[in-house]
Each structure stands twice: as C-alpha cells, then as structure tokens.
C-alpha cells in the first residue's frame, strides 16, 4: 500500500517537523559562518552536513512508497539531529559559542526531537492500520 496517501501539492514542506528542522538548519548555517577558518573542513563541515541531513532524510522518507521506509529515514534524521547536538557541544567546549547560545540551540533540538518522535509514532500507527 502507498506510504501515506499524502497530498503531494505541499509535500514534506507542509510537515511541522520539517519546518522546524529547516529553521534549525538555517540557524546552523549562520552559526558555522562564525567558526574559525581552521574548522572549515572539520566542525563546520560536520555540523552543516548533519543539519542538512535532518531535513533531507525527512524529505526522502516522505517520498518513499512504504511506511517502514519512511520510518527508517525518520530514524536516520533523528540520528543526524543528535549528531548536531554533539557538534554543538564541541562548539561549546571550544568556546565558539557560550552556554546561553548553546541552550537556545538545545531548545530547538528538543523541539525537533519531540516532533520527529511524534511523526515516527504516527507513521508506526498508520503502518499497523494497513
């Protein structure tokens, strides 16, 4: 059976979790521009890739045919989100960001994590209803 019966006119861009992850991705992009040049191919690249993976996996999962495939991509998205938190911890430890800024990013992380877990639960229930 087709994965979700979603209306593809708005597609994944209508998902609240994707919208919040997009904001986070854009925030990470702005943040990494302030990192030292010595981090260009290290922390900067890792944080950019991980934050982009969060939204990309949600989008790719949305386009899959079966619920289980979508769930798996959402789990990958969740892993990338957690990777971002680790990279932000490194940025804190290296004093590229202060504790207040870290807590702001962590709050965004927690919001996305809750939305992502909710979306995974929704997809799991839909799969069981097939």
Model region roles, listed by residue range:
Residues 1-130:
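Amphipathic alpha-helical assembly/interaction segments
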């Amino acid at each position: 059976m087709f994965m979700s019966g979603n209306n593809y006119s708005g597609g994944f861009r209508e998902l609240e979790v994707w919208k919040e992850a997009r904001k986070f991705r854009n925030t990470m992009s702005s943040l990494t521009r302030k990192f030292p040049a010595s981090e260009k191919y290290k922390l900067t690249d890792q944080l950019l890739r991980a934050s982009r993976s969060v939204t990309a996996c949600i989008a790719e999962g949305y386009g899959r045919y079966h619920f289980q495939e979508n769930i798996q991509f959402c789990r990958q998205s969740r892993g990338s989100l957690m990777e971002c938190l680790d990279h932000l911890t490194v940025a804190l430890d290296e004093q590229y960001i202060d504790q207040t800024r870290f807590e702001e990013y962590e709050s965004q992380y927690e919001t996305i994590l809750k939305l992502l877990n909710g979306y995974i639960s929704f997809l799991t229930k839909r799969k069981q209803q097939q």
